[in-house]
A protein has these predicted regions:
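Short aromatic-glycine-enriched beta-strand elements
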Residues: 189-191, 249-252
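Structural detector for hydrophobic anchor residues on beta-strands
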Residues: 134, 170-171, 200, 236
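ABC ATPase nucleotide-binding domains
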Residues: 5-7, 11-163
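Glycine/charge-rich catalytic "coupling/switch" loops of P-loop NTPases
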Residues: 154, 179-185, 190-244
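C-terminal boundary and immediately downstream tail of ABC-type ATPase nucleotide-binding domains
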Residues: 155-176, 217
């Protein structure tokens, strides 16, 4: 593995406390099988630190850096050799919420600027959706679905993916018939599904057989509340049980 041309940022950053910022960044160049002159090392380190906005901190001790600065130093060290592949192992998990959001934007910018292929491992669904072009969902060591963030979120392949990525309401049912209404362009098939709540009109990208047992996924943001009986399909009576104020939105629990 040490001969492969890739950079890696560990979850714990692995910043060496006895080295300053310059020395930490230069270490991969100094131990590389390719020999670099002192001036080459200096230029490469300065370029890497400038990329992650750490210019001017070359002589600062690693232990004097903030959490966000340590994260950027680990990233500079991974980028200094100009790798063909960048591996990130939950690099933001040790940061507080506000800093984590800022670093998500920074990582996205750097990836686009450097055009380096990046594999990012995370348990944070928001990070995965925000940072990725392609997402691979792994369950018990097996990849269960690969797709764009939108595909993963809107078209989960099974119960695990639907329940794992974002909040959802899962309803079991049996397909009774095809819908008579016209359907939207991005959904190829429409079926009437019999459930414990009655008949539900469900859209899917997959062709299904009449009588098939299926699982309907309804995202909270696709549910609308009304005090009057609406027209059309897919509405049910419910009792409001609880409302949680979460700042930018309300979490409403219905029975």
């Amino acid at each position: 593995p040490n001969l492969r041309h890739f950079g890696m940022v560990f979850q714990s950053y692995a910043i060496w406390p006895h080295m300053n910022v310059f020395e930490n960044t230069a270490f991969p160049l100094q131990t590389s099988s390719v020999k670099f002159s002192k001036i080459q090392i200096k230029n490469k380190v300065e370029a890497a630190l400038q990329t992650v906005d750490l210019s001017g901190l070359e002589t600062r001790e690693a232990t004097k850096l903030s959490g966000g600065q340590q994260q950027r130093l680990a990233l500079a060290r991974a980028l200094v050799t100009e790798p063909r592949l960048l591996l990130l192992d939950e690099p933001l998990s040790n940061l507080d919420a506000q800093l984590r959001e800022r670093m998500q934007v920074e990582l996205k910018r750097l990836q686009q600027q450097l055009s380096v292929t990046t594999v990012y491992v995370t348990h944070d669904q928001n990070e995965a959706l925000a940072l990725s072009h392609q997402i691979g969902i792994i369950n018990e060591g097996r990849i269960v679905q690969i797709g764009s963030p939108r595909d993963i979120y809107e078209h989960p392949s099974n119960r695990f993916v639907a329940d794992f990525v974002g909040e959802t309401n899962l309803i079991e049912g049996t397909i009774n018939s095809k819908c008579k209404q016209e359907i939207s362009a991005d959904k190829k098939y429409c079926y009437q599904v019999q459930t414990v709540f009655g008949s539900i009109m469900a859209l899917t990208t997959n062709s299904c057989q009449i009588g098939k047992q299926v699982l309907i996924s309804i995202r909270p943001q696709d549910i609308h509340l009304s005090i009057q009986k609406p027209d059309g399909d897919n509405f049910w009576k419910a009792t409001l049980e609880n409302i949680l104020f979460l700042g930018e939105h309300l979490d409403v629990r219905l029975n």
